[in-house]
Amino acid sequence: MNRSQGIERLQNENDPWDVVVIGGGATGLGCALDAASRGYRTVLVEAADFANATSSRSTKLIHGGVRYLRQGNISLVRESLHEREWLLSQVAHQVHTQPFIIPTYAWWETWYYRIGLWFYDRLAGSLGIRSTQRFDKQSVLNRVPSMNEENLVGGVMYWDGQFDDARLCIQTAQTIWDNGGLALNYMKVTKLLKTDGRLTALEVLDVMSGKSFSIRSKSFILATGIFSDTLRQQDVSNNPLIIQTSRGSHIVGDEKFLPSGTALMIPKTSDGRLLFLVPWLNKVIVGTTDIPDDNIRLEPRTSAEEVDFILENFSR
């Protein structure tokens, strides 16, 4: 993956590309890899670095869809289980299994979650990782000694997937190159070029050199996440907005909170969301929040209210 050689190839290309993807996050990289692996002449351009925004700021989990079980969305649970199994088998060096404990503070909660996760195990079938286990109070404390033990009854342990989101994106970019495509970062789209009212080319700025040039293509895929409406309105100024933006924040704590490496899922918070405490690179990631935020920017900031929300629910 040599950026200079890629730009040279891009500038020397006379024929239109088959596919140009705008956006180098998980969605854009996935689209570009799919196209390149099917033999389409493909180029991806990203205005910043690969996975620079949402795609590198996740809770680092490959969900099997357990959160959708509560919503009754069985089809999405099945889809998530299949996707998790594919990643665990095909990208085993980036994805691994992770145990989670759901602590319970009433006897009925233990059976409520146990029965729900039993059904989840049945849905998973051969796609499951390990069977759900019911723990008594001491077994929970053995795994998570920092747990608030006041009124603690026990818990339920289930298994899910964990991955390095940014590394998987970088590997996907490399695989695009391996399949004959180009994935170029710090290439900002500055203008949409049309012929007879049809989009036929992009004008892009090489942020690192300051040089601009055009890229012609037969088709274009817009995968810029929260920035999608900006380009859509460059195309047609009165295009209706289609993106509703929100901000999800995490805080990072010391690994001493989860010394055994077992993650926690807190099923009840003050706003009804789930809260995860997940071991990660000798630290613990705690989150996430979900609040509306119309201030679209590359580097959002966590508010004091979000930190208070996480700490309040984490310390219960």
Task: For each feature predicted by the language model, list its residue ranges.
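Core beta-strand elements of the Rossmann-like FAD/NAD(P) dinucleotide-binding domain
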Residues: 15-17, 209-219
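Glycine-rich Rossmann-fold phosphate-binding loop(s) that bind the pyrophosphate
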Residues: 23-25, 47
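N-terminal Rossmann-fold NAD(P) dinucleotide-binding loop
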Residues: 28
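Flavin (FAD/FMN) cofactor-binding and adjacent substrate-gating region
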Residues: 104-180, 184, 192-198, 203
